């Protein structure tokens, strides 16, 4: 029996006969649903990545659903992989524009069936030796692939299987009777589609007119879930007699409405709203009018260069006008009960400070999307460190507050194979070849709606002007806007874009903030990412909801830039500086919730990986910057758990550069209290051995012994009764770690004196450690590290045998998890058989300078098959090799750990358990 057939037999046995068998198999049938941890879309993308051809049979397709597969389909096209899509015009659901998008797929043949009631949802993938299918309830729509509660089944079958033959035969039968999709067919369909759309529109308008007669002229606006939570937080702050608060809210998340709702709740006698831009000011006033009870229009006034409505109950002022002495001093300092500073990160500027320091309202609220932007005073300090609520991009998308987006990281134009790593050297930014390439990409990835209304961000003014001319000459109406243009001219151009009279506004950084163009349905980034904050600001220009679009397309041209690593940082919102997190984000198709998707073309993704590999994210200056940002937020020295709670740097990054956090604080003079040498070394121990949270039992045993000394039996019984899924061996290992007997001789030079002492009867804290506990500062750091250990341990709870697939582990970690008496780091040379475990640690790319005898040619033969070499000087008759060949009979489990190259340090990715393939052994030398 072939290995593939055997794998199928075991997979199907597990799927249809006995779920308890240990074989996990690559072909086990699987139910596909959409939930927080998995999406139907990710399976379809995964199958596409591996297939040699594909066939989709789906009744309903949306532009957004198709967009979520476009990057993958383009990569397949570049590899010569072709496919077929069979759909229909059933119920007139599919739009003419969507059919046009299907025609852009050069490697996909599309046909339409006129079979009555066509309602199929099937995806077939042909691989080299087998086929797989996703069949169930999901159409090719964003909601069906990512959000809706769906039931689909992933089935795999051998090429000669009856099921795949039946499904493929049915597909072929329909395909032969179907009509090829053409421009002519689309034009014909468009006429009937528009007629039906007009009929539906008339029905909707008639319904709206009937409803309008029954609805009051003024409808009370109620808060959404996130706004309601923020309002409760603001009230709680005021209830504590605090008079300032800060709202951090992603662009487009409705912070103005939130503010108006709070003002309605407070009902101040007089209210002041301050912002830097008159356009924002007018929009804010209109938003407030929708929320607040209006008695007279005169209740709302403006204080600008042209308006002086100083007696209005609700006054909206530009900072440029208000900050003049003769303007703000005409008011009494207590005149306003409630003052709002919009774009509050500007509040540290001198113009704002004059106003900020003059007025004494009962309550002052700051609102910003980017509190980190200030280069002067701390915004957090200005608002007394009272963060009422924080709405970041991911959370806003999950709550459906923002317009969904499809992000495409695409490969930038390469001139004659030359890769430039400095945009200022690239002479071809606006060459005809690159402009044609840009048009090709932006057309392929498209936009939602009938008219293209986009923003393009470039690197220089000259590039903006030249690109606008080139695009316009090719029929794509474009206008460049820069800081040299007047405010009035900018507004005229913006209105043209809103009305669809032009297709693109091209700028450098003019629209990073303070601009509101909800109609934008495509954002194009033609410059390297230099700042994750600016990246999100520019992406955010398209995230306001608008009736002209269902989603916004974001196209990011990724060149050979050193700063590409900032892209996953920006998109994920993850400020941990942890490279592993960013690499997982790049490979995880479920990395963002809601119908939004993040997609990378294969070459572009490789360029980001290269940038991540090259950059050092644990530089002292980056750690110090993260520290100062959190310190600014809190107003005091942060502890390690503060970094976690403030979504800042991962403490493990600090430990990769400093032996412990105390050492970092001393280096940068952030702490006055000094510890003894032994106390500092003990903190090194806790930072390296306890804080990672590898085993929950370690921190629990420590906490028990911190309370009082115990006999071994007392400790054992307490742990076994109170903690699930632990053994006596786990407790013994924890004790060996705490008394340092787990480690090799001389470890005290690094970790100081042991933490505990024990004899045949009692276990207690060592004298040196007891003395350290009398130091309040040492205690503070210790408690923080224990809390960090508990937090980190949560990610290990779901692991079988303490190991989680694709997590990173060291040889020492393995020794702890499997309760070896001693740290095996120095004795596991590639692999080791001990008890019933055999960990295998493989470095895939060896250094060129290692000896030929150890330059093993380990190699992945397939996704689940590895060619592996034993140590040198072994034969098939060697006792060790015989153990490996008979490992199943002897009950020995193999665990595979892999790192890419020696430079990756002591950590290896865990790929799972393995088994020897009978008959595959060979003595090479």
Residue ranges and their predicted role:
Residues 1-224:
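PLD/PLD-like phosphodiesterase catalytic module centered on the HKD motif
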Residues 135, 504-507, 511-528, 534-537, ...:
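A short beta-strand element within the Helicase C-terminal
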Residues 194-223, 443-444, 448-449, 453, ...:
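Long, largely alpha-helical accessory region at the distal end of helicase-like NTP-driven motors
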Residues 239-263:
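Walker A/P-loop
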Residues 282, 307-310, 327, 465-466, ...:
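Conserved helicase ATPase core of P-loop NTP-dependent helicases/translocases
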Residues 345-406:
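Post-DEXD/H (motif II) to motif III coupling segment of the RecA-like Helicase ATP-binding lobe
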Residues 387-455:
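Conserved interdomain linker/interface between the two RecA-like ATPase lobes of SF2 helicase motors
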Residues 532-537, 541-571:
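Conserved segment of the helicase C-terminal RecA-like domain
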């Amino acid at each position: 029996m072939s290995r593939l057939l055997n794998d199928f037999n075991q997979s199907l046995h597990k799927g249809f006969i006995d779920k308890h068998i240990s074989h996990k198999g690559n072909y086990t049938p699987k139910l596909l649903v959409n939930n927080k941890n998995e999406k139907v879309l990710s399976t379809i993308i995964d199958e596409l990545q591996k297939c040699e051809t594909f066939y989709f049979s789906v009744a309903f397709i949306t532009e957004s659903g198709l967009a979520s597969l476009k990057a993958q389909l383009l990569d397949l096209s570049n590899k010569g992989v072709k496919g077929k899509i069979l759909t229909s015009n059933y119920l007139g659901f599919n739009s003419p524009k969507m059919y046009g998008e299907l025609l852009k797929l050069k490697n996909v043949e599309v046909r339409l069936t006129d079979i009555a009631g066509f309602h199929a949802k099937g995806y077939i993938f042909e691989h080299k030796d087998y086929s797989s299918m996703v069949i169930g309830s999901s159409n090719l729509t964003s909601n069906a692939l990512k959000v809706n509660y769906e039931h689909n089944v992933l089935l795999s079958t051998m090429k000669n299987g009856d099921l795949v033959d039946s499904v493929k035969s049915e597909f072929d039968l329909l395909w032969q009777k179907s009509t090829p999709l053409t421009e002519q067919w689309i034009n014909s369909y468009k006429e009937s589609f528009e007629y039906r759309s007009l009929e539906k529109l008339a029905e909707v308008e008639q319904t709206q007119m009937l409803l309008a007669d029954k609805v009051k002229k003024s409808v009370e606006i109620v808060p959404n879930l996130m706004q309601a939570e923020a309002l409760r937080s603001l009230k709680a702050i005021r209830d504590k007699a605090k008079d300032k608060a800060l709202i951090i809210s992603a662009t487009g998340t409705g912070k103005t409405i939130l503010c108006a709702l709070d003002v309605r709740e407070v009902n101040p006698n007089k209210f002041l709203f301050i912002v830097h831009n008159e356009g924002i000011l007018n929009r804010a006033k209109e938003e407030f009018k929708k929320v607040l009870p209006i008695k007279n229009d005169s209740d709302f006034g403006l204080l600008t260069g042209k308006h002086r409505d100083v007696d209005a109950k609700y006054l909206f002022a530009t900072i440029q006008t208000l900050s003049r002495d003769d303007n703000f001093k005409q008011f009494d300092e207590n005149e306003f009960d409630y003052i709002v500073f919009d774009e509050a990160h500007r509040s540290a500027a001198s113009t704002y400070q004059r106003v900020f320091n003059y007025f004494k309202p009962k309550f002052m609220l700051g609102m910003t999307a980017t509190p980190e932007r200030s280069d002067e005073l701390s915004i957090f300090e200005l608002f007394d460190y009272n963060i009422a609520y924080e709405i970041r991009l991911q959370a806003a998308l999950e709550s459906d507050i923002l317009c969904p987006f499809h992000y495409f990281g695409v490969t930038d134009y390469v001139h004659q194979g030359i890769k430039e790593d400095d945009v200022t050297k690239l002479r071809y930014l606006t060459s005809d070849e690159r402009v044609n390439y840009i048009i090709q990409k932006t057309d392929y990835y498209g936009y939602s709606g009938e008219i293209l209304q986009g923003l393009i961000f470039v690197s220089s003014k000259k590039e903006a002007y030249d690109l606008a001319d080139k695009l316009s000459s090719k029929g794509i109406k474009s206008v460049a806007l820069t800081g040299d243009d007047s405010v009035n001219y900018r507004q005229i151009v913006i209105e043209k874009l809103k009305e669809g009279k032009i297709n693109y506004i091209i700028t450098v950084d003019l629209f990073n903030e303070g601009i509101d163009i909800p109609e934008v349905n495509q954002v194009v980034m033609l410059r390297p990412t230099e700042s994750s904050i600016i990246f999100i600001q520019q992406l955010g220009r398209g995230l306001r909801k608008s009736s002209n679009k269902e989603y916004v397309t974001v196209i990011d041209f990724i060149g050979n830039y050193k700063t590409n690593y900032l892209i996953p940082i920006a998109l994920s919102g993850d400020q941990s500086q942890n490279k592993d997190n960013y690499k997982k984000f790049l490979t995880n198709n479920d990395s963002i919730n809601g119908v939004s998707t993040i997609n990378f073309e294969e070459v572009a993704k490789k360029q980001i990986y290269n940038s991540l590999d090259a950059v050092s994210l644990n530089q002292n200056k980056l750690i110090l910057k993260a520290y100062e940002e959190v310190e600014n937020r809190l107003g005091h020295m942060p502890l390690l758990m503060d970094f976690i709670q403030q979504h800042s740097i991962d403490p493990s990054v600090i430990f990769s550069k400093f032996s412990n956090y105390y050492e970092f604080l001393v280096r940068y003079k952030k702490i006055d209290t000094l510890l003894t040498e032994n106390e500092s070394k003990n903190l090194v121990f806790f930072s390296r051995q306890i804080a990672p949270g590898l085993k929950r039992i370690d921190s629990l045993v420590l906490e028990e012994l911190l309370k009082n000394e115990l006999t071994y039996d007392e400790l054992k019984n307490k742990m076994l009764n109170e903690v699930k899924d632990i053994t006596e061996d786990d407790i013994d290992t924890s004790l060996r770690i705490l008394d340092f007997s787990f480690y090799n001789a001389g470890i005290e030079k690094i970790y100081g004196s042991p933490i505990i002492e024990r004899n045949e009867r009692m276990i207690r804290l060592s004298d040196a450690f007891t003395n350290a506990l009398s130091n309040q500062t040492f205690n503070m750091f210790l408690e923080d590290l224990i809390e960090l250990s508990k937090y980190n341990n949560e990610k290990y709870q779901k692991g079988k045998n303490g190991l989680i697939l694709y997590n990173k582990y060291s040889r020492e970690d393995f020794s702890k998890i499997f309760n070896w008496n001693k740290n095996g780091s120095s004795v596991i040379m590639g692999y080791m058989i001990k008890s019933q475990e055999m960990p295998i640690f493989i470095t895939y790319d060896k250094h060129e300078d290692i000896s030929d005898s150890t330059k093993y040619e380990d190699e992945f033969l397939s996704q689940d098959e590895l060619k592996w070499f034993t140590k040198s000087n072994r034969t098939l008759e060697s006792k060790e090799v015989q153990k490996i060949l008979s490992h199943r009979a002897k009950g020995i489990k193999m665990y595979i750990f892999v790192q890419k190259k020696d430079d990756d340090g002591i950590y290896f990715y865990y790929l799972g358990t393995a088994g020897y393939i009978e008959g595959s052994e060979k003595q090479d030398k």
